[in-house]
């Protein structure tokens, strides 16, 4: 038996219930509230203010905020975006660390000095939660576990969501009624599962043969140090080692959040903390010096190994246009293009712009959203998966570097003068006006041109070499 609670919206527009108080759910709540809706946000976890920070950050890959995410923040609240962006650290490119620990190579991201931006996931989530606490139109209920969705199939019915309070095993479930409901509860979405029980939804879940382990580079406290950062804070640091790699992103306090990615077979072949230290010292000698034995041993013994999973689903809305999934609940991707959060925030912006276009008709907007978004979400999920190979292996390949240099040169000096040319990374990270699918289509055409240029160039070099060799041989015979 459950207790029905209908949210009072008598002095407001219609009521919206959102499941998931992560990054995307919080931004969605702020976006709906800004449009005049009464919002209730449900979260399974306890209030972050009551949880020790060290427990929250054990499995939190730092975020790279780029133009798509920033545009979505500014769409919802320009002043809020400015407050958040005060705490970012710009990263102008990748810094590639070699196997000796003595050489580093910068590979710039932007054509004209553009940067992506490092920010701590927990900090950003706290910022969004703090913004919601200033709103009279958003009610946040922590420790609420979704157990059932109902009334999703008939036009004349209003959706309901049933929750249990995880703090009280004896409490009766409570059922809440809303005009519209949104699932933003992550890759393991209970909201999505409940939708699937009552409607036809394509769904695929794929675990990637990859684990991640979080590490930490402390601030530089050496006497006489000129910076609190041990390595350049304005780069995303990568230690590429073909089938495994280490990355590090700067934090405002001078520390770096570092993450080790590898196939499960690699980490499982290491049988002890001491073996882990030896492995780390051999493969990442400069990072080893910054972390030290004690930290590496603690990480091996205490930090959980995270799994990487890709989730796709379609459609994202229910038949009546009253329920929808966004963010990782609809499209969980691997973190290798830095677009997971940016894409989720863009989901919110695209949905809100549809509501604007449809003059506040949320039902029509929910129904249009699936077709409007699918090809872009499919495109970025695939691109994120493909980019692991680039980050872990190709960034050190001479042919790759030549190709990237040519791509960069054409984008910087030829684009807009001789012909249109934009590198893929520029389109994905810095051109929020170009949808993901369109960016990849443009890149495909440009890649064909680059392939032909490379073939012609290599053929010309080979012919030149053959002619020179023939001339040398002719002189030798004389």
From Swiss-Prot:
Keywords: FAD, Flavoprotein, Membrane, Mitochondrion, Mitochondrion outer membrane, Monooxygenase, NADP, Oxidoreductase, Pyridine nucleotide biosynthesis. It comes from the Eukaryota. It is found in: Mitochondrion outer membrane. The keyword Oxidoreductase applies. Pfam families: FAD_binding_3. GO terms for molecular function: FAD binding; kynurenine 3-monooxygenase activity; NAD(P)H oxidase H2O2-forming activity. Pathway: Cofactor biosynthesis; NAD(+) biosynthesis; quinolinate from L-kynurenine: step 1/3. Its EC number is 1.14.13.9. Its main location: mitochondrion. GO terms for cellular component: mitochondrial outer membrane; peroxisome. It catalyses: L-kynurenine + NADPH + O2 + H(+) = 3-hydroxy-L-kynurenine + NADP(+) + H2O. One of its GO terms (biological process) is L-tryptophan catabolic process. Its cofactor is FAD. InterPro entries: FAD-bd, FAD/NAD-bd_sf, Kynurenine_monooxygenase. It is an enzyme of class 1 (oxidoreductase). Catalyzes the hydroxylation of L-kynurenine (L-Kyn) to form 3-hydroxy-L-kynurenine (L-3OHKyn). Required for synthesis of quinolinic acid. Belongs to the aromatic-ring hydroxylase family. KMO subfamily. This is Kynurenine 3-monooxygenase.
